[in-house]
């Protein structure tokens, strides 16, 4: 039995209503949604596991809520006593219950956001300040540009036609929720939204409520834990599921809304179907940086699978078009083409469900589309055979080999309809289809290849040594450039089959041979991670030529570390000064900047400022050489890795650094948050498009010289402080490993790549994602804020007038404001008291003073941050976010304690607790606790501990809405 009677416990529903702020607005239904889902879940929990376990859940929640209200350490001690007395089976159920409740809270929030959005649009209210941190609507942006900023509608239209946002989906291991659960969450979200529809009947409501309970129970009964790590092919399939479920239909729907918004500002012309407004790329199966599981076979399979999926989607829609375009009037060009196709038709197509007999010439559009269908069928089947067997008996000329071939008959149909007075029909499903073909092509998404610069150096070093001309690795940068350019200007082959090859060298060359073998439209960019110099780019250009890549991929240097960002503009300027290279790029260059590793290298403050300056300098260099530069932003989901609200991130970039062309990564859990549902997909496309347009037509202010000088000065202080602790403090590596679940991260099986670039090594070799993940789990968020406090304190102590300047910067400079606001949000999610508990349980006694020093630094930074922003309390300007975070805190606290005590039991074999009798009715005394580890038979720990730990990690990640 629970230690306190049920009568003394407040229900979670009542606790929620007592805890959260008053109704934020008339559109606020969050608590109502949240309470409904929790009521249903608690009923299910009682049915499945009994009243005693439900009481224990409520008791844990109450103690957490009391702690969050008063921050009384005694409440943590009481909660710890409850949690440590649970037997392994009950621990798993409690962890799973709280993790599930946090997922339900997320779903309630998503439905609330969609509801508020609809209410806002109904009112025509585009100036809701409470939405400022999260919303950016395309129609709102058009009206702002034309009405407030006096841009002409034609200027807006022209800018939009030439704008491109390329969203690059990556398999970064930050999505901790299994696909099986994501699908169930989607159905829960749908049921909840429909339950609150105004026109719902009593019978509908009853059936929806039953469906809601069914899906909640199904999600709870599904194993949350991935029992094996996903392969790169698994990651690609998971990523492609978003295209199939939401993006495929979302793109034409969004572009139709753009047409409507244009019409509302006086443009009576549709956006051209081939305007590259939204593009999609992927790293899934192409990102080799530190991931040995991405092989040439993986890259080949991923490309072919994507092509097969694209052909299948086109094929599934072509018959709908054939039904729609039944008219007989057409222009002469189409009539002639249809007659030719009709005469050459030799057989009935009995493998089709519809239109399986020869289509008569009196239906010319159907004749044309029937031929398109035939080629799509053959394209799909040939790709399927290539994927399965490596060869196909279907001739290549019976299929579509490039997107121009595919578009031509569709364009012919479109022109004919327009010329015959049927433009409204042309602008229906056919226009949507044309836009899909233009956006997705035959490859569905273009695959980027990413590889470390050192791996290319290894290959070239092997070549030069084999040629007996020295060691490329030991050459100076000038010598490397001289040799590379000499070879690029010549024609001799550099190596043959006798080149000695290590496994790593073979991987680089085999990858390039796969690129040469597959259709060129499968690929996008070749990204060089850890790029430092011009030779890194020239090396890839030479290797592409040597491996016979007929249409070379554009080569994109990725500058990540602080020093590399500082020298990026000089490296690019040198490239632009090389005549061979200028001729190669044809006036266009792409440069990627990395937010994750720069933050791990120098801290968030200095990294953010250096990223800002690097972009300014790169754009300046590009303008001087007449090159159109596209910035590729490698942003993660967390603030520590460059994350934050999309449109604010874009609008705070330096002036002229976007210019209508933007690439950005969409990583891990951010993919689900951006594309998990149709309305989320629509909102994501709106935000990126609107913010990119606004940045180009109404650039943010440039920082004043005195602001720059102050930022330069304090960035040095921030970097010194950060590095003095993370890299120079001898106690830090040991403390970090003990005070966080850093070492246990890999057990979550949420990605195919290792958590370290090298098996040994300290913080330097640890990847940015587990680095951020570990500190996020303990709610201390050290990588985000460390260095801020020292920088601000230095400036204010030096001259109190600097505080006034900080206020000015916060109020007038979008970059500075966004930087401060995001860190303020992280502090609102933080809890140093919880971090202190991890220290108390897990850290050796000699390291405890170090932890206290860091927490003192945390409090000082928090206080200084509020001074800079001119705020009394955290998030005082964002009541919606404040409400959402407070709703989650009590769930997360329970999981934090359960995680900390579980880590204690895992790491300290001498730590013993007194367990009370089993309380869940699912496992009776006649069943041994050993059954609990049937799902995890290989665990090296006592029964239930590893699963409990992983469930707490997933739950905390869900509650904080990010992992790494």
Swiss-Prot record:
By light-reversible phosphorylation. It catalyses: oxaloacetate + phosphate = phosphoenolpyruvate + hydrogencarbonate. One of its GO terms (molecular function) is phosphoenolpyruvate carboxylase activity. Pathway: Photosynthesis; C4 acid pathway. One of its GO terms (biological process) is photosynthesis. Its cofactor is Mg(2+). The active site is at residues 172, 600. It is found in: Cytoplasm. It is an enzyme of class 4 (lyase). Keywords: Allosteric enzyme, Carbon dioxide fixation, Cytoplasm, Lyase, Magnesium, Phosphoprotein, Photosynthesis. One of its GO terms (cellular component) is cytosol. InterPro entries: PEP_COase (IPR021135), PEP_COase_bac/pln-type (IPR022805), PEP_COase_Lys_AS (IPR018129), PEPCASE_His_AS (IPR033129), Pyrv/PenolPyrv_kinase-like_dom (IPR015813). Its EC number is 4.1.1.31. Signal peptide: none annotated. The modification Phosphoserine is found at residue 11. The keyword Cytoplasm applies. Tobacco, a typical C3 plant, shows characteristics of C4 photosynthesis in cells of stems and petioles that surround the xylem and phloem. NCBIfam families: PRK00009.1. Through the carboxylation of phosphoenolpyruvate (PEP) it forms oxaloacetate, a four-carbon dicarboxylic acid source for the tricarboxylic acid cycle. Belongs to the PEPCase type 1 family. Homotetramer. This is Phosphoenolpyruvate carboxylase. The lineage of its organism: Eukaryota, Viridiplantae, Streptophyta, Embryophyta, Tracheophyta. The gene is PPC.
């Amino acid at each position: 039995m629970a230690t306190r009677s049920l009568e003394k416990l407040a229900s979670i529903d009542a606790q929620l209503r007592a805890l959260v702020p008053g109704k934020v607005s008339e559109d606020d239904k969050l608590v109502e949604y949240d309470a409904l889902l929790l009521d249903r879940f608690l009923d299910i929990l009682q049915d499945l596991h009994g009243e005693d376990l439900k009481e224990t859940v409520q008791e844990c929640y109450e103690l957490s809520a009391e702690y969050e209200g008063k921050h009384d350490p005694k409440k943590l001690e009481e909660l710890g006593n409850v949690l440590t007395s649970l037997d392994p089976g009950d621990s798993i159920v409690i962890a799973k219950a709280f993790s599930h409740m946090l997922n339900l809270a997320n779903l309630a929030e998503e439905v609330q956001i969609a509801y508020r959005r609809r209410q806002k649009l109904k009112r025509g209210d585009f100036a809701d300040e409470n939405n400022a941190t999260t919303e950016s609507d395309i129609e709102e942006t058009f009206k702002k540009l034309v009405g407030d900023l006096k841009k002409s509608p034609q200027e807006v239209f022209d800018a939009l036609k030439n704008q491109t946002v390329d969203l690059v989906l990556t398999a970064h291991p930050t999505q901790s929720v299994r696909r099986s659960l994501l699908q169930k969450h989607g159905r829960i979200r749908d049921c909840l939204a429909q339950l609150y529809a105004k026109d719902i009947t009593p019978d509908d409501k009853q059936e929806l409520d039953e469906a809601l309970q069914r899906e909640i129970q199904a999600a709870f009964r599904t194993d949350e834990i991935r029992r094996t790590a996903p392969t790169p092919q698994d990651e690609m399939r998971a990523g492609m599921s978003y295209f199939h479920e939401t993006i495929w239909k979302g793109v034409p729907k969004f572009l139709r809304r753009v047409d409507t918004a244009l019409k509302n500002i006086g443009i009576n012309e549709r956006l051209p179907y081939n305007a590259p407004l939204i593009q999609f790329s992927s790293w899934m199966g192409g990102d080799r940086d530190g991931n040995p599981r991405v092989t040439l076979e993986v890259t080949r399979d991923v490309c072919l699978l994507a092509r097969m999926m694209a052909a299948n989607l086109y094929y599934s829609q072509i018959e709908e078009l054939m039904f729609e375009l039944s008219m007989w009037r057409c222009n002469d060009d189409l009539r002639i083409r249809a007659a030719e196709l009709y005469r050459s038709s030799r057989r009935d197509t009995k493998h089709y469900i519809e239109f399986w007999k020869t289509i008569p010439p009196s239906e010319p559009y159907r004749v044309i589309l029937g031929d398109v269908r035939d080629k799509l069928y053959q394209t799909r089947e040939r790709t399927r055979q290539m994927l399965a067997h490596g060869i196909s008996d279907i001739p290549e000329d019976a299929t579509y080999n490039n997107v121009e071939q595919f578009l031509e008959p569709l364009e012919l149909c479109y022109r004919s309809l327009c010329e015959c007075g049927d433009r409204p029909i042309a602008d229906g499903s056919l226009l949507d289809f044309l836009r899909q073909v233009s956006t997705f092509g035959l490859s569905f998404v273009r695959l980027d290849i990413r590889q470390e610069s050192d791996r290319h150096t290894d290959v070239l070093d092997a070549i030069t040594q084999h040629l007996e001309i020295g060691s490329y690795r030991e050459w100076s940068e000038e010598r490397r450039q001289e040799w590379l350019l000499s070879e690029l200007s010549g024609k001799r082959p550099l190596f043959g089959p006798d080149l000695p090859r290590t496994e790593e060298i073979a991987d680089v060359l085999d990858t390039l041979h796969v690129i040469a073998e597959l259709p060129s439209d499968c690929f996008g960019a070749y990204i060089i991670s850890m790029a430092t110099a011009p030779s890194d780019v020239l090396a890839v250009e030479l290797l592409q030529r040597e491996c016979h890549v007929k249409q070379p991929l554009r080569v994109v240097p990725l500058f990540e570390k602080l020093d590399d960002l500082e020298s990026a503009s000089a490296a690019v300027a040198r490239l632009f000064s090389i005549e061979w290279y200028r001729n190669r790029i044809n006036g266009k260059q792409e440069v990627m900047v990395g937010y994750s590793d720069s933050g791990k290298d120098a801290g968030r403050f200095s990294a953010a400022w250096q990223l800002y300056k690097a972009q300014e300098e790169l754009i300046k260099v590009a303008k001087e050489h007449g090159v159109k530069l596209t910035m590729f932003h490698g942003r993660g989901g967390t603030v520590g890795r460059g994350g934050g609200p999309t449109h604010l991130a874009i609008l705070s970039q330096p002036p002229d650094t976007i210019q209508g062309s933007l690439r950005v990564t969409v990583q891990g859990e951010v993919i689900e948050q951006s594309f998990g549902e149709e309305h989320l997909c629509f909102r994501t496309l709106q935000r990126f498009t609107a913010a990119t347009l606004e940045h180009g037509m109404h650039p943010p202010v440039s920082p004043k010289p005195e602001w720059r000088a102050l930022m330069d000065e304090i960035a040095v202080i921030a970097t010194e402080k950060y590095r003095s602790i993370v890299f120079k403090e001898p106690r830090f590596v040991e403390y970090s490993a003990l005070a966080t679940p850093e070492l246990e991260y890999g057990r979550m099986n949420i990605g195919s790549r290792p958590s370290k670039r090298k098996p040994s090594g300290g913080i330097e070799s640890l990847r940015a994602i587990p680095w951020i993940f570990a500190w996020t789990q303990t709610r201390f968020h050290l990588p985000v804020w460390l260095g801020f406090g020292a920088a601000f304190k230095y400036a204010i102590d030096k001259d109190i007038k600097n505080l006034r300047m900080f206020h000015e910067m916060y109020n007038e400079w979008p970059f500075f404001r966004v930087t401060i606001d995001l860190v303020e949000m992280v502090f609102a999610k933080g809890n140093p008291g919880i971090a202190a508990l991890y220290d108390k349980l897990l850290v050796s006694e000699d390291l405890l003073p170090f932890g206290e020093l860091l927490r003192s630094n945390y409090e000082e930074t928090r206080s200084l941050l509020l001074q800079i922003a001119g705020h009394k309390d955290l998030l005082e300007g964002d009541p919606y976010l404040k409400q959402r975070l407070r709703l989650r805190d009590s769930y997360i606290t329970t999981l934090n304690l359960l995680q900390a005590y579980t880590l204690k039991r895992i790491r300290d074999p001498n730590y013993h607790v007194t367990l009370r009798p089993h309380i869940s009715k699912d496992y009776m005394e006649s069943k041994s606790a050993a059954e609990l580890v049937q799902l995890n038979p290989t665990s090296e720990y006592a029964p239930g501990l590893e699963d409990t730990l992983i469930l707490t990690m997933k739950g905390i990640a869900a509650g904080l809405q990010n992992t790494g």
